[in-house]
């Protein structure tokens, strides 16, 4: 499986058979230009949307005619099982920012979890609904989402083997959130990839948790 970071909370996940999934596509230039990542130029077969904010739900920015996945209904598309688990975008049961959906997908024998804009620690029931995750795509920037400490706890509770941080402060993002280094200081094993993508196979998953930091386009 190939994972490419498009910026913010958006990734392109591509299976060996060529099925393409894009998570949380953003509207470039939204929020008065605060979302300064390059416009998405990729196409997809499937698009997942964790919640309806402009930096996560710009489905029209994705090429092709993808099937759009919203909400917590379990489904299977192009041979890929997708489970949605309903959570919240804040610590007040959605009163501040509404609901958020975590998506669990199995691609090439790898269980991938995309946390969207998770705003709280996971309950035991939420963690049980997700089960163990091989590759975790997690926000780490805080303020609108969980921050470094909570992200570390969530990764540990899900038994994540590869942790790819997202939704953190970069030169392209004007939101008042924390940089990735605040999260990396808490983690023992960190690999910075020179480039926007990484390939991961089920046979090569690390025995100990490892953080993989990607560059954005």
Task: Tell me the role of every PLM-derived stretch.
Residues 25, 51, 140, 166-168:
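Short secondary-structure boundary segments
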């Amino acid at each position: 499986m190939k994972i490419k970071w498009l910026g913010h909370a958006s990734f392109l996940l591509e299976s060996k058979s060529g099925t393409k999934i894009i998570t949380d596509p953003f509207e470039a230039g939204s929020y008065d230009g605060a979302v300064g990542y390059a416009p998405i130029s990729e196409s997809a077969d499937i698009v997942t949307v964790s919640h309806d904010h402009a930096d996560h739900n710009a489905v029209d920015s994705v090429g092709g005619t993808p099937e759009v996945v919203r909400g917590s209904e379990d489904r299977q598309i192009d041979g890929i099982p997708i489970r949605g688990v309903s959570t919240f975008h804040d610590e007040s049961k959605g009163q501040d920012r509404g609901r958020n959906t975590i998506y669990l997908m199995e691609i090439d024998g790898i269980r991938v979890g995309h946390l969207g804009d998770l705003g709280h620690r996971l309950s035991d029931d939420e963690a049980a609904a997700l089960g163990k995750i091989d590759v975790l795509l997690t926000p780490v920037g805080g303020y609108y989402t969980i921050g470094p400490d909570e992200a570390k706890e969530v990764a540990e509770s899900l038994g994540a083997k590869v942790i790819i941080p997202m939704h953190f402060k970069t030169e392209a993002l004007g939101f008042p959130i924390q940089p990735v280094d605040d999260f990396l200081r808490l983690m023992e094993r960190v690999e910075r990839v020179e480039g926007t993508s990484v390939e991961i196979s089920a046979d090569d998953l690390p025995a100990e948790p490892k953080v993989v930091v990607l560059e954005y386009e």
